[in-house]
Swiss-Prot record:
Pfam families: OMPdecase (PF00215). This is Orotidine 5'-phosphate decarboxylase. Pathway: Pyrimidine metabolism; UMP biosynthesis via de novo pathway; UMP from orotate: step 2/2. PROSITE patterns: OMPDECASE (PS00156). The active site is at K69 (proton donor). The lineage of its organism: Bacteria, Pseudomonadati, Pseudomonadota, Gammaproteobacteria, Candidatus Palibaumannia. GO terms for cellular component: cytosol. Belongs to the OMP decarboxylase family. Type 1 subfamily. The keyword Isomerase does not apply. GO terms for molecular function: orotidine-5'-phosphate decarboxylase activity. Homodimer. The keyword Transmembrane does not apply. GO terms for biological process: 'de novo' pyrimidine nucleobase biosynthetic process; 'de novo' UMP biosynthetic process.
Amino acid sequence: MTYDVLSAIASPIIVALDYTNISKALAFVDLISPLYCRLKIGKIMFTRFGPELIIKLQQRGFDIFLDLKYHDIPNTVAGAVSAAADLGVWMISLHAIGGEKMMAAACNALSNFGLGVPKLIAVTVLTSLSDEDLQIIGIPSTASDFAIRLAILAKNCGLDGVVCSAQEAEHIKNICGHHFTIVTPGIRLATDELGDQCRIMTVHQAQQAGVNYMVIGRPITQATKPNCRLVEILNSLKITANSVALSSN
């Protein structure tokens, strides 16, 4: 079977890796192409395997979203962001709720990195949190309204974009501008189960909402032929910047 595919830069898919064994992680990664996605490394894998994992993935040609969601005093976050940039990652996350000074310090820490500077994005409200969850921790706002407020703060601090639910993406784009990057987790295919996230959308809904990057985990990592699944998703989104015949087998 052949598919029309795209250039590496055009893909909106970020595959979330979630493995406790580095050999299994690399075995999966060797089944997919960096032409079709980037990779997200979170707290569990980075804590287990450290920078060595990042290097191994970069050697295979993948751009890395280092999703450690930094949240600390400004100097500490600035130092952590600088250290992450030294690893050559493509994108770094921090928590917007850390506040204006923290986010400004993080931006300033990247000011001397030149053309290879990573994208710096702020997590707004975790997609696992509902309005009721926010009320319980003392935030008298809906998840959507709070996410929008944090996105505006992040933009004003100079960040490149935010991580948010697809439900807020369109509104945030309208307020913060077309060039403000939206990264959305909790993206599922139409036939998938919800998993542990309660504010989700399908890939097509996310595309229509203006999401720039869609974080997808188990629908790809648990697929029998993950590379074919990637191409199927990209074709369904009609992302064919460069038409190249890919033979899937």
